[in-house]
């Protein structure tokens, strides 16, 4: 697995950035950087499951490892599925995807807030993450700063 790092400085409170990351409707606004109808179902609770999907494209299921409100979210992917909601646990693509990990860290220092995103993934997904996060981080920043 490779480690990818992305970050953006945001002029907003940790509460606002946390809300942008975890609220269903706000998530849809920035996650469109990855797919047009990207959304999630589930609760941000340690040990719980969450599903990220686009109804037209399928998605992924993840288990939440860490929830430190206003500070850190961490989860790892355990399955991918087709638009018809059938899991692909044995497919070649699934074997490369399962185990991928995402970590979202909100760091504050004086008046600075930095959102750090760390991804551990297979080489096949580097381009997807690079392109997606290049679009998603400015959206997260803009949405967070709307009501800062």
Indicate where each model-derived feature is located.
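A generic structural signal for beta-strand entry/edge sites
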Residues: 1, 49, 70-72, 110-114
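Short beta-strand segments that buttress and anchor functional surface loops
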Residues: 49-55, 75-77, 117-119
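Short amphipathic
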Residues: 3-10
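Hydrophobic-ligand binding "helix-grip"
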Residues: 38-41, 57-110
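A conserved amphipathic terminal alpha-helix motif
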Residues: 95-98, 120-148
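Solvent-exposed alpha-helix faces
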Residues: 22-25, 138
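Short beta-edge strand/loop motif at the mouth of beta-sheet-based domains
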Residues: 5, 25-61
């Amino acid at each position: 697995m490779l480690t990818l790092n992305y970050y953006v400085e945001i002029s907003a409170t940790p509460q606002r950035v946390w809300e942008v990351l975890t609220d269903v409707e706000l998530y849809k606004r920035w996650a469109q950087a990855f797919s047009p109808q990207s959304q999630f179902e589930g609760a941000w609770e340690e040990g719980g499951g969450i599903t990220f999907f686009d109804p037209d494209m399928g998605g992924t299921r993840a288990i939440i490892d860490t929830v430190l409100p206003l500070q850190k979210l961490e989860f790892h992917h355990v399955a991918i599925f087709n638009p018809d909601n059938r899991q692909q646990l044995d497919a070649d693509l699934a074997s490369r995807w399962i185990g991928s990990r995402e970590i979202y860290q909100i760091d504050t220092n004086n008046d600075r807030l930095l959102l750090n995103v760390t991804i551990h993934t297979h080489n096949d997904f580097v381009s997807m993450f690079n392109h997606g996060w290049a679009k998603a981080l400015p959206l997260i920043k803009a949405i967070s700063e709307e009501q800062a």
